[in-house]
Design a protein with these regions (language model features):
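Long, charged alpha-helical interface segments
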Residues: 49-142
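Short phosphate-binding loop-to-helix
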Residues: 1-2
Length: 143
């Protein structure tokens, strides 16, 4: 039996139905024991936090961060290190109360939930690194 430390979904495209389904799959109950569940979609980063759980992110100061309850209600949602802190609030599904927050000057954001599945979108996270390219072949030296 496998026990991964992380699952990362990488995808994109212009089909909204595919986007919603793929991102939604990260909230599957079978993934709740995996310590880190995240994804890259069209160059934007997201994390999925299964409750009860905590997540700390280091993000560029003043960048945008959104908390969205995509999979049902989330209870006891707290966030600090942002312009607008939340302290143990309940988020209803797909309600914009957690949308468009701003990372504080320190760049460290702490998120905690008591129950539910919370999706965290952080659009300003750098794109994933590209695989290294092959070095050019050595050139001959003529003396």
């Amino acid at each position: 039996e496998m026990h991964p430390a992380r699952i990362t979904l990488v995808g994109g495209g212009n089909r909204l139905d595919h986007s919603i389904t793929a991102i939604g799959a990260l909230g599957h109950r079978g993934l709740m024991l995996i310590p880190r569940v995240d994804g890259w979609w069209n160059g934007e980063h997201l994390d999925v936090l299964h409750g009860p759980g905590e997540l700390q992110l280091t993000l560029p100061p003043a960048s945008t961060l959104s908390l969205v309850a995509l999979h049902g209600p989330c209870a006891g949602v707290s966030i600090s290190g942002t312009r607008w802190a939340l302290d143990s609030v309940d988020l209803a599904p797909l309600v914009g109360w957690g949308v468009s927050n701003e990372v504080g000057p320190g760049g460290v954001v702490s998120i905690r939930i008591s129950a539910g599945i919370l999706t965290i979108f952080n659009a300003s996270t750098p794109t994933p690194p590209t695989p290294p390219t092959e070095p050019p072949p050595p050139t001959e030296s003529h003396s």
